[in-house]
Amino acid sequence: MDYLVKALAYDGKVRAYAANTTDTINEAQRRHHTWPTASAAIGRTMTATVMMGAMLKGENKLTVKIEGGGPIGAIIADGNAKGQVRGYVSNPQVHFDLNEHGKLDVRRAVGTSGTLSVVKDIGLKDHFTGQTEIVSGEIGDDFTYYLVSSEQVPSSVGVGVLVNPDNSILAAGGFIIQLLPGTEDAVIERLEKRLSTIEPISKLIEKGMTPEEILEEVLGEKPQILETVPVEFSCNCSKERFANGIISLGKAEIDDMIEQDGQAEAQCHFCNETYVFTKEELEELREEITR
């Protein structure tokens, strides 16, 4: 079962998150039929998004959009404080040979000229929006840059995905380490040293390490676990929502659907679920407009 942990370390001066998202990203791959490089891109993005969601409270939620100008197009992910995340990519069938480091070439797929934007719905009239430039296209570095530049929190983000030969997901997960005000230089140096020498996060998960063990490996000390949150691919789309969307198109548009196709199909971008509206159902929706 996928889950994430929130923790503190170094006498409360370091805030940390770690997640195993293997099943969640596997579900995204199954729904969107992504090829390996696209799976790595969407998997890294969804993993970072669900950890950023853990920084929120209650019913608050966020949307991340990455547009780097590469062949994959846009990557969109939604997350919330409950460990629920969903996501999709404009062009799921994108794959390249491994890069010079023997890893999936996410940078080539994502591109390096564009933006990472975050919109947070924290229950106020206006949403919080932050945007930074893509700095590497590798996703983890781009989230690090966003947190440092837009939210002014010194951070390190590590996210990774390993893909099986049959395109299913072997391992996926990540961590976010954040320095709180007043962190001593010695602690910062120690963390920088550890971050530069640890194995890729996806390898740690493949080895069977838990989020708690990953944080201990990254931090160099046993953290104080504050909360454990289950993580899952979750989409809140429904036939009722799409029905309301069809009603909003107006009577003439619904008449066209009935006359030309005798039915209507609506597909959710986020989960690929398809909803079919029969002629009778469309007529009922049309009736609702004229009531």
From Swiss-Prot:
InterPro entries attached to this UniProt entry: Heat_shock_Hsp33 (IPR000397), Heat_shock_Hsp33_C (IPR016154), Heat_shock_Hsp33_N (IPR016153)
An annotated GO cellular component: cytoplasm
Keyword list, A-Z: Chaperone, Cytoplasm, Disulfide bond, Redox-active center, Zinc
Biological processes, Gene Ontology terms: protein refolding
Xref: CDD domains: Hsp33 (cd00498)
Alphabetical list of HAMAP family matching this protein: HslO (MF_00117)
Family: Belongs to the HSP33 family.
Protein name: 33 kDa chaperonin
Organism, scientific name: Bacillus pumilus (strain SAFR-032)
Lineage: Bacteria, Bacillati, Bacillota, Bacilli, Bacillales
